[in-house]
From Swiss-Prot:
Recorded family membership: Belongs to the FARP (FMRFamide related peptide) family.
Major subcellular location class: secreted
PTM annotation (Phenylalanine amide): residues: 61
Residue positions assigned to the propeptide: 23-48, 65-66
Biological processes, Gene Ontology terms: neuropeptide signaling pathway
GO cellular component terms, semicolon-separated: extracellular region
Record localization: Secreted
Keyword 4Fe-4S part of the UniProt annotation: no
Signal peptide: 1-22
This protein's name: FMRFamide-like neuropeptides 24
Highest taxon in the source lineage: Eukaryota
Keyword list, A-Z: Amidation, Cleavage on pair of basic residues, Neuropeptide, Secreted, Signal
Protein task: FMRFamides and FMRFamide-like peptides are neuropeptides.
This protein's encoding gene: flp-24
Organism: Caenorhabditis briggsae
Amino acid sequence: MSRTSIILVLAIFVAIAAIAQCRNIQYDVDEISPEAAFRYAQWGEIPHKRVPSAGDMMVRFGKRSV
């Protein structure tokens, strides 16, 4: 077998494994909130940064006093 065919076979194997894994993701449809219904259990809680308001940024950069 040539080098290209070996790489092609490995790429196909990885693609099949990825498709099989994504089909095994378990999710809860019975969640109360609509946004929680699309959150997968394996992912857990993703920490979110707080976005500062325009007033916070004005205070930070000296455009407005507290």
